[in-house]
């Protein structure tokens, strides 16, 4: 007998019909695309679910100008905890490869959900983007190469998360993201994943047309992550990097 998949295990505990009722009882999700594209380069800050102060950190990030919060895959309760304390949109970074996960993300209070283009055939990619939009969520389609960017756009993605190829060096990552940014049409919200350079990456990606940047936990593991996120959010709002020029 084949091992039970994580999604099958979850649906055995909470059937899809029950999950849908729970999801639709939640407040209407906030519009992620509007939050991320507002005339400046916005910042999405990732929160480590293992942190004991994760809800306090969510409040700090929001108060310091972060446009959205991202929660990695792992503890499903973390998304609900963060969503309860944050007044900005929340992105679930658990890669959604099944409709059940879209519904679960909404039931937990997420406003945006990650859909990995590389892990899905075209039909499934289109279906998941449409499912997210149909329940007022924002699908953030993860893209690591030009082929998947084209597929994401054909699937109707309004927001794309541009990430470098797995295993790329810092220099290779910057080159790959620059290439992807140059391929994105104006109508799509372009989110670029910041590398170790942080500030330098934000400036570089902004000049290449990024609407937002994702700050991973490795960039926010210092003594005062709130200050770090706030500084980068302020930098993204600088007139020199304005997206409305």
Which residues does each predicted region cover?
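Glycine-rich phosphate-binding active-site loops on the catalytic face of alpha/beta enzymes
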Residues: 71, 104-124, 160-170, 208-231
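Glycine/Thr-rich beta-alpha phosphate-binding loop at enzyme active sites
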Residues: 48-74, 150-181
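C-terminal helical cap(s) of enzyme catalytic domains, especially alpha/beta-barrels
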Residues: 176-183, 206, 219-245
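Surface-exposed amphipathic alpha-helices with a cationic face
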Residues: 33, 37, 62, 79-85, ...
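Catalytic cores of alpha/beta
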Residues: 90, 97-109, 144-158, 186-215, ...
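Conserved, mostly hydrophobic/aromatic
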Residues: 1, 45, 61, 69, ...
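An N-cap/entry alpha-helix motif that binds or orients negatively charged groups
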Residues: 1-56
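Short beta-strand/loop segments at the ligand-binding rim of alpha/beta enzyme cores
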Residues: 40-45, 81-93, 131-140, 183-193
């Amino acid at each position: 007998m084949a091992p039970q998949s994580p999604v099958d295990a979850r649906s055995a505990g909470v059937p899809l019909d029950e999950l849908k009722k729970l999801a639709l009882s939640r407040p209407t999700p906030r519009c992620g695309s509007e939050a991320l594209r507002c005339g400046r380069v916005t910042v999405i800050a990732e929160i480590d679910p293992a942190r004991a102060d994760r809800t306090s950190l969510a409040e700090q990030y929001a108060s310091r100008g972060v446009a959205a919060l991202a929660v990695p895959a792992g503890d499903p309760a973390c998304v609900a905890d963060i969503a309860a304390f944050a007044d900005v949109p929340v992105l679930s970074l658990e890669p959604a490869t099944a409709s059940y996960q879209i519904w679960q993300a909404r039931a937990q209070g997420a406003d945006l959900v990650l859909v990995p283009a590389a892990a899905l055939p075209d039909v499934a990619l289109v279906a998941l983007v449409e499912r997210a939009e149909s329940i007022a969520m924002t699908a953030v389609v993860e893209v690591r190469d030009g082929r998947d960017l084209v597929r994401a756009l054909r699937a109707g993605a309004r927001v794309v998360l541009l990430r470098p190829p797995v295993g790329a060096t810092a220099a290779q990552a910057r080159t790959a993201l620059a290439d992807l940014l140059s391929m994105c049409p104006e109508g799509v919200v372009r989110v670029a994943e910041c590398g170790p350079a942080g500030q330098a990456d934000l400036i570089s990606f902004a000049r290449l047309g990024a609407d937002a940047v994702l700050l991973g936990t490795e960039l926010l593991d210092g003594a005062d992550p709130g200050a770090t996120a706030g500084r980068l959010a302020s930098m993204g709002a600088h007139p020199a990097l304005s997206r409305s020029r």
